[in-house]
From Swiss-Prot:
May play a role in mitochondrial aerobic respiration. May also regulate mitochondrial organization and fission. The gene is Mtfr1. GO terms for biological process: aerobic respiration; mitochondrial fission; mitochondrion organization. It comes from Rattus norvegicus (Rat). Residues 94-135, 168-201, 286-335 are annotated as: Disordered. Belongs to the MTFR1 family. This is Mitochondrial fission regulator 1.
Length: 335
């Protein structure tokens, strides 16, 4: 494969006129033999591409319908010239556009040649033409005539205004001779009635503290509402001294207890709260041992309920002894 590529390259270089040795082994960094591409370019005769050429022409040599074949070369005037006579928006050369035939009814009009963007200064545009000076004088005359008409209109408006001002006081005098009936204003509404005084507080022997607190709270709320209507103010915080002021005069009713309430209730075996309380008492009995010894030394009698209490069905006595509780009690007593 490599040999075939070498043979192909030798054939190509022989056809061009370049030796293989000079291409591969010549390492000159200058001249036309610096690279293979430069060598091929110097030996091959390449045809240059055609370039665009622009030519400036005068008005006399522009295209005309009588001489369609002349001035075929594109110029700078043709670059931005757009044909708008047929409603088209595409850019074309002036040589490709044909003028429309003139109508019979309309008189021939001289069209303005297409405008060109010329960067060279034009001496003809610097001098003002006599036609433009005449047009400016006519415009000034028209403006002065309009100003005179405006001044006359202003004078007429001022006369009309003065006549209206003179007629208005005379009409006012005529109106003043007629009697004018004045309607009296409506009387103001009567003031609101004052709030009723609070009822006197009567203490009954059967009233309780809750009733007194409720009454005082209602009185305070009613007084606060009246104050908010007249003078909106913030309500003060309730004072316990005012609430408990008449507590000494309150008499409590004696309540008779039934025999069932006096007797101690028997402990329910199925009550979980009682079982848990009894278990906790048994568990933490060693903590109150020192207190019980002190009470025995002082001679404080034990309550009969403890002595006559029945043994609990649930507690640490139902568990098997492991010896850990005794060790704990001994450690606590030693400490």
């Amino acid at each position: 494969m490599l040999g075939w590529i070498k043979c192909l390259m030798r054939m190509w270089f022989q056809r061009v006129g370049v030796s293989m040795q000079s291409v591969l082994w010549s390492g000159k960094p200058y001249g036309s033999s610096r690279s293979i591409v430069r060598k091929i370019g110097t030996n091959l005769s390449l045809i240059q591409c055609p370039r665009v050429q622009f030519q400036l022409t005068s008005h006399a040599t522009e295209w005309s319908p009588t001489h369609p074949g002349e001035d075929v070369v594109a110029t700078f005037a043709d670059v931005g010239w757009v044909a708008t006579d047929e409603g088209e928006c595409s850019t074309r050369l002036r040589t490709e556009v044909r003028s429309k035939p003139p109508l019979e009814n309309n008189p021939p009009c001289f069209e303005k040649p297409p405008s060109r963007h010329i960067s060279l200064p034009n001496s003809s545009q610097d001098k003002p033409s006599p036609k433009t000076t005449l047009a400016s004088e006519e415009a000034l005359q028209k403006i002065s005539a309009l100003e005179n008409e405006l001044a006359a209109l202003r004078a007429q408006i001022a006369k009309i205004v003065t006549l209206q001002e003179q007629q208005s006081p005379s009409a006012g005098c005529l109106d003043s001779s007629t009697p004018v009936i004045v309607v009296p204003p409506p009387p103001p509404p009567p003031p609101p009635p004052p709030p009723l005084p609070p009822p006197p507080l009567v203490l009954h022997p059967s009233t309780s503290a809750l009733d007194l607190i409720k009454e005082r709270r209602e009185q305070r709320l009613s007084a606060g509402k009246t104050l908010a209507k007249g003078h909106p103010k913030k309500l003060d915080m309730p004072n316990m001294l005012e609430i408990l002021k008449d507590m000494n005069s309150v008499k409590l009713r004696p309540v008779k207890r039934s025999e069932k309430d006096e007797k101690p209730r028997p402990v329910d075996i199925t009550d979980p709260a009682a079982l848990i309380a009894e278990a906790l008492k048994k568990k933490f009995a060693y903590r109150h041992r020192h207190n019980s010894q002190g009470e025995a030394e002082r001679g404080i009698p034990k309550p009969e309920s403890d002595a006559t209490s029945e043994p609990a069905l649930f507690g640490p006595h139902t568990l098997k002894s492991t010896g850990k509780m005794k060790a704990l009690i001994e450690n606590v007593s030693d400490s």
